[in-house]
Amino acid sequence: MMWGTKLLPVLLLQHVLLHLLLLHVAIPYAEGQKKRRNTLHEFKKSAKTTLTKEDPLLKIKTKKVNSADECANRCIRNRGFTFTCKAFVFDKSRKRCYWYPFNSMSSGVKKGFGHEFDLYENKDYIRNCIIGKGGSYKGTVSITKSGIKCQPWNSMIPHEHSFLPSSYRGKDLQENYCRNPRGEEGGPWCFTSNPEVRYEVCDIPQCSEVECMTCNGESYRGPMDHTESGKTCQRWDQQTPHRHKFLPERYPDKGFDDNYCRNPDGKPRPWCYTLDPDTPWEYCAIKTCAHSAVNETDVPMETTECIQGQGEGYRGTSNTIWNGIPCQRWDSQYPHKHDITPENFKCKDLRENYCRNPDGAESPWCFTTDPNIRVGYCSQIPKCDVSSGQDCYRGNGKNYMGNLSKTRSGLTCSMWDKNMEDLHRHIFWEPDASKLNKNYCRNPDDDAHGPWCYTGNPLIPWDYCPISRCEGDTTPTIVNLDHPVISCAKTKQLRVVNGIPTQTTVGWMVSLKYRNKHICGGSLIKESWVLTARQCFPARNKDLKDYEAWLGIHDVHERGEEKRKQILNISQLVYGPEGSDLVLLKLARPAILDNFVSTIDLPSYGCTIPEKTTCSIYGWGYTGLINADGLLRVAHLYIMGNEKCSQHHQGKVTLNESELCAGAEKIGSGPCEGDYGGPLICEQHKMRMVLGVIVPGRGCAIPNRPGIFVRVAYYAKWIHKVILTYKL
């Protein structure tokens, strides 16, 4: 009986061990994948930096590797008793990694510059805050909350204990630093050097509280790297598990350091992509500052009568969009549901139904009271006056000699002398080098849309500068179409109302879809480029991963068209010149031209089309029917001159050289929501061309109200310049 009593625990232990072994064997593949996932997100990166040590006894390990990711994985595994990796340097040119048991905060260690080196430091060892219970904290705080110095972990004086470094490997019980080896409530703690106080917690703040946020957190640059549900953030310079466009080199002013929470696109608060493949992104839990003290450079200038910059500081009472349609109240969900509410954007002054720019769009805007037009810009609000000095330009700015050296997207201009080879590629004359000073905005190629400059960003090789025309120097009105014309031929959804179904020969027509839902039309002008309206992408920092370009389809609902359709991702947006309402979409890969997919020609620059020329618009938009069939439709319009167009609009419209007017041949036909971005196609000398782009109008196909389109011929040189220079 005694023998059986002794044997029972042994048998029980064997049973438990066998059960654990079976569990180990049955670990799913997904968990194994998780263990092998990239660990670079656990490190803080310092570009072009290396470490030098004064103590020759400090060991360094080195090995040739393929990438910084491999360096990180090996560093995390190097947590032995004699060597614990706290940082590494990756030599990009030699593909070599150097692992260090110290970091930049260690005594006798200095940072140094190295063009080919990138320093990565394990954030657990350098952060001055904790996440959750602080079980991963490995910082150097060694004072308790009440100010008592901590007792070393390997000492038994004045308090005996069992928390020995050898018993808690991996918990970094070094020196007398505060730790939480068991992950207990209260956070990191230590035994104290006071015989009367055995142990006490340390005063280490939560990472969510180290830096508070003001407004919606657009200027937040704190160290929070977990979402509000506890998911670890994905690094901004990584594309796995989620592909995105917010690359640090593309947006140098957005603070895309490592994997910290940020708000680059006007969301209600900071967020990040997550390492969970099933959760693309989540918000982060960051406290709001008690006082709205914020860097003055981050605060837009408040105006009430005009727009400064992109109008983020506009606080006036204009409450209609550019064509007179009243705005929907921000606190209303009718007729359009949305999340840009006064509660979510408390500091954006979303009062009443006034035009505002809460999300960093191109200018103030609002949801409209028209159920068929979701969003409209308030472009009738004038720009604030610019001075008549060197910070404005006349004509097309070819004689501008100011000192501005930043693009409209905030990128610093690149030196002209480093870009002369690229400049010679798209102009046919020798530029005046005396005007190309340093990296100042200039117009050496006689661009019709103003000064510009090259950038150091390969994704945005060049862009226009935020300089306005001088006061009194306005865009000229379009010529009367009765005069001789230059030949165009070379040797929210808007919908076509009451159009007739088209044939399948319009292979240049593109359906732009967001999460599989049609939102806009577009025109395939080159195998890799689509021309559409910027209203389809109102925020400059729009994430493109949920957008697709569908080509070769006649039925937007995809019925019976699986064989001929092509579905392509969008890799880049290129916004048109200021006020153009155009955007070019770079496709992730070129379209394959066949019987169902083709390109449409562009008109010659500056050409005009004769009045009364019959043209056509195409779209999948609103048809006036409750159960729309989803078929591509066409409506025929005729070109209308400036004077007649103005009469139909009760004298409220005066066309300029960037606009085109066309009226319906059939009463009640015209563009409506769902057709935004689609083309106005005209034929001249047996050549079909995209002469106009559909942009929001006043209502849908209103009788005797001709539509106003973006005149593509006015922007033809810009389109060709982008296609020639945007290579990535």
Swiss-Prot record:
**Which molecular function terms from Gene Ontology are attached?**
chemoattractant activity; growth factor activity; identical protein binding; serine-type endopeptidase activity
Identify one Pfam family in the record. Answer: PAN_1
Q: Please indicate which superkingdom the organism of origin belongs to.
A: Eukaryota
* Any one GO BP annotation for this protein: positive regulation of DNA biosynthetic process
What region holds the Kringle domain? Answer: 129-207, 212-289, 306-384, 392-470
Q: How is it modified after translation?
A: The single-chain precursor undergoes proteolytic processing by TMPRSS13 resulting in an active two-chain form. The single-chain precursor undergoes proteolytic processing by HGFAC resulting in an active two-chain form.
Residues in domain PAN? 38-124
Extract the CDD domains matched here.
Answer: KR (cd00108), PAN_APPLE (cd00129), Tryp_SPc (cd00190)
Q: Where is the signal peptide?
A: 1-32
Pyrrolidone carboxylic acid PTM positions:
33
The UniProt family comment states: Belongs to the peptidase S1 family. Plasminogen subfamily.
Assembly behavior: Dimer of an alpha chain and a beta chain linked by a disulfide bond. Interacts with SRPX2; the interaction increases HGF mitogenic activity.
Query: By what name is this protein known?
Result: Hepatocyte growth factor
Gene that produces this protein: Hgf
